[in-house]
Amino acid sequence: MKIQRKIKRKPNLMIIGAAGAVANAVLLKLPEYRNSFGRLVLLDKKGNIRKNKHLDHKKLRYVFVRKKINLPAKEKEFLSLLKRYGIGVLVDLSTIDTIPILEALRRIDVKYLNTSMNIADGASYSLVFDLINNRDKFSEGVRILCSGMNPGVVNAWVRLGIETYGVPDRVTFIEYDSSRPASGWKTILTWSIEQFVNESSIERSAVMLGGDRVRLSKDVAVMCREDMAKYFRPIMKMADYPKGFVVPHEECASIAMLFNVPAKFVYAIHPKTMERLVSLYKKQGELSNHDLLLGDNVKMPLVGRDNIAVRLDYKDKAVYYMNSMDNSDQKGTNATCAQVAVGVLAGLRTLLKGDLPSRVYFTSELFNKGYKDFVLDSMAVQKFVFKKKNGKLKMSEHVPEIH
């Protein structure tokens, strides 16, 4: 008697927002994992993917669809598109509002991954609170949310610290992206200008107090700045330390909610760029997408590096995890997008394993599901441990690259 074995088909993958800077960084790495899924469908309202000379188009073996997604107005059209290509996994690298996509996916068997929470009116962190409080509403499939760098990878670091040292008294996410044009001067940003403008000059500055409690500032993040010397000085020597923007961010919200711990994010770009943005905001009363140019490190070569760290404070110690990437080490993308791509691919690999029950997940909840291991295998992460004594820090451990 012959035993028939059912061959499990590889899921077809669609990436929306496929012509963006982050998608470009993901597609540079995706050929390494091309045999993990079936058909690859790249979708964007722009049609410039085929002209990208840095991508291995032959190995990617993709179908490109030039289309603008309009949700919820054209939900049926969107679902029809997913069915037409037999999509099993949807990776969202767009700036489309998140909730309409999640609502649409309730009516189709598709797994979903995104890098951030997008909302036209309101605060992105409020979506995180709502989704954690109402997980059952979107339990029709696996949903991995906020799996980029900030948020995403950094939350895997926090969970690593919690597993090793326990829940801290507070968590501080810090980032200093010193990128600038290699020649001349331009006011640039290395990732989504639209998202940056929203969180720095439209949403009010905020810090998480633990649980779903939030301390809101009266002003926006571009006008709420904090000296980053106290955070970076223990782990990095700089001639001058920047004053970063205190930005409300999804990684703070999910960590605060899941572990009931205060959390905040302080973000700095090149000091000259920040001063220019502050000046523009004071003059205009707002920032616009036209105030910045995308520094892609391709058409516009860049110098500088993106330094991202998280500090976990305990009564007797401070623990840091940090990654730095230099633009000079990247080909076809910039350091920032290369960092984000690690989170996207970690989330995708976790999804493709297929052993997650249907529900909403944030990256700190994927600790034992392979996510952390992929991150540590894909980027150099340093660990610093400092003892606290008389208000000062004394280093007790430094691991140049953890595994």
What are these regions (language model features)?
Residues D56-P72:
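Rossmann-fold cofactor-recognition segment
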Residues S116-G141:
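Rossmann-fold NAD(P)-binding glycine/threonine-rich loop
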Residues I132-R180, G343, L348:
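Adenosine-phosphate binding glycine-rich loop
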Residues K2-K10, T164-H403:
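C-terminal catalytic/substrate-binding lobe primarily of soluble NAD(P)-dependent oxidoreductases
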Residues D44-I49, I119:
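Helix N-cap at the beta1-alpha1 junction of Rossmann-like dinucleotide-binding domains, i.e.
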Residues N70-K83:
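Conserved Rossmann-fold cofactor-binding substructure of NAD(P)-dependent oxidoreductases
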Residues L13-K29:
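N-terminal Rossmann NAD(P)H-binding glycine-rich loop of SDR-like oxidoreductase domains
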Residues L90-A104:
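Beta-loop-alpha module in the N-terminal Rossmann-like domain of NAD(P)-dependent dehydrogenases
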